[in-house]
């Protein structure tokens, strides 16, 4: 009987833990807004398009604890009518017409170390 109880209890304990320690966990976008803003700015500076892209929809936001925080953010991006070389404090809304907006999905990975005021874009897949 004892030999049967231990494996059953161990299995129940493992199922109850859910996510592994150190695995990415879903979080609210408000916890990763700075990381998302940073990633979008880097994305825009790295494209050859003359128009800015903005976030049309947040699909998923996760945080993984890795010598700081790694934010894994999946968003739908779309084109705005604002030119990159003319934007100062202009509000740039996404084109309403999907043919002009040309939406696409990106996953950004941003590494943050709160004790150092430094963000790094460590992954971008669009």
Swiss-Prot record:
> Where does this protein reside within or beyond the cell?
Secreted
Major localization listed first in the record, in broad terms: secreted
Q: Does the keyword Coiled coil apply?
A: no
pH-dependent activity: Optimum pH is 5-6 and pH 6-8 for papain and bovine cathepsin B, respectively.
- Kindly give the InterPro entries that the UniProt entry links to this protein: Cystatin_dom (IPR000010), Cystatin_sf (IPR046350), Prot_inh_cystat_CS (IPR018073)
Q: Where is the Cystatin domain?
A: 22-115
Provide the leader sequence positions. 1-18
Q: How does activity depend on temperature?
A: Stable between 20-40 degrees Celsius.
Which PROSITE patterns does the UniProt record give?
A: CYSTATIN
Q: Which SMART domains match?
A: CY
Q: In which tissues is it expressed?
A: Ubiquitously expressed in normal tissues including brain, eye, gill, heart, gullet, liver, spleen, stomach, pyloric ceca, intestine, kidney and muscle. Expressed, but not up-regulated, in lipopolysaccharide (LPS)-stimulated tissues including kidney, spleen, muscle and gill.
Q: Where is this motif: Secondary area of contact?
A: 64-68
* Keyword entries, A-Z: Disulfide bond, Protease inhibitor, Secreted, Signal, Thiol protease inhibitor
What cystine pairs are annotated? Answer: 82-92, 106-126
> Under the cellular component aspect of Gene Ontology, which terms does the record hold?
cytoplasm; extracellular region; extracellular space; vesicle
**Which residues make up the annotated site Reactive site?**
22
Gene Ontology molecular-function annotations: cysteine-type endopeptidase inhibitor activity
Function in brief = Thiol protease inhibitor. Has high papain inhibitory activity and inhibits to a lesser extent fish cathepsins L, S, K, F, X and bovine cathepsin B in vitro.
Query: Which PANTHER family is this protein grouped with?
Result: CYSTATIN, CYSTATIN C (AMYLOID ANGIOPATHY AND CEREBRAL HEMORRHAGE)-RELATED
The family assignment reads: Belongs to the cystatin family.
What is the protein name stated in its UniProt record?
A: Cystatin-C
């Amino acid at each position: 009987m004892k030999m049967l109880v231990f494996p059953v209890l161990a299995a129940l304990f493992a199922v109850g833990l859910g996510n592994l320690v150190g695995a990415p966990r879903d979080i609210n976008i408000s916890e990763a807004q700075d990381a998302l803003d940073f990633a979008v700015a880097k994305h825009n500076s790295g494209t050859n398009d003359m128009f800015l892209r903005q976030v049309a929809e947040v699909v998923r936001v996760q945080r993984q604890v890795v010598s700081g925080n790694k934010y894994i953010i999946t968003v739908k991006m779309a084109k705005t009518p604002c030119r990159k070389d003319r934007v100062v404090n202009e509000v740039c809304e996404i084109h309403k017409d999907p043919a002009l907006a040309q939406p696409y999905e990106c996953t950004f990975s941003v590494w943050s170390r709160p004790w150092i005021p430094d963000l790094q874009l460590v992954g971008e897949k669009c």
